[in-house]
Amino acid sequence: MSINKNLLFCGGFFFVVLYSLFVMRPFRSAVAAQIGTSDLTFFLLLVVLVMLIANGIYSLLVSKIKESKIVLFIYGFFVTNLFLYALFNYVFPNSYWVGASFYVWYNVFNFFVVSVFWARAVNCFNTDDAKKYFGVVSACGSAGAWVGSQSVYLFLSDSP
């Protein structure tokens, strides 16, 4: 198996995607604990409703914008959202609604960043190359998930 630029691009891309998910996952879990089990069902229903709306918007965007631009647009949208959540968390520390909306947002983010990645990755390879390389790409994603979770552990632990 030879290493080509599509494999490097997709492997690196998926590493970063899953890294970001696993860095944010403990914060989502903390928010879920803050929400409590009595309200969690409501917020899961809210996730489904937001996903229905977001998928409709995404379908409309995909029909109007080139594939290379849609990836930049979607990821740019989510990066902007992250900065806004950092600002909201700074301005409104310990806000129930900032945390609860982050919980919904994270679940939508989780779905979209992985789906958009695979939609892009499928177009990087022909059928034969996909059979050869998708396992490696998945392994790169798994490595990103592990490094992301370990980064949080190291950052939050008291040991040097």
Q: Where are each of the predicted segments found?
A:
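Hydrophobic alpha-helical segments of secondary membrane carriers
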Residues: 13, 74, 136-140
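Transmembrane alpha-helix termini and helix-breaking/packing motifs in multi-pass membrane transporters
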Residues: 35, 52-65, 86-91, 119, ...
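Hydrophobic core of transmembrane alpha-helices in multi-pass small-molecule transporters
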Residues: 15, 94-113
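Helix-loop boundary and gating motifs at the non-cytosolic
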Residues: 2-50
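Glycine-rich segments within core transmembrane alpha-helices of 12-TM secondary carriers
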Residues: 41-53, 131-152
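C-terminal ends and interior cores of transmembrane alpha-helices
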Residues: 76-95
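Intracellular juxtamembrane helix-capping segments at the cytosolic ends
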Residues: 109-126
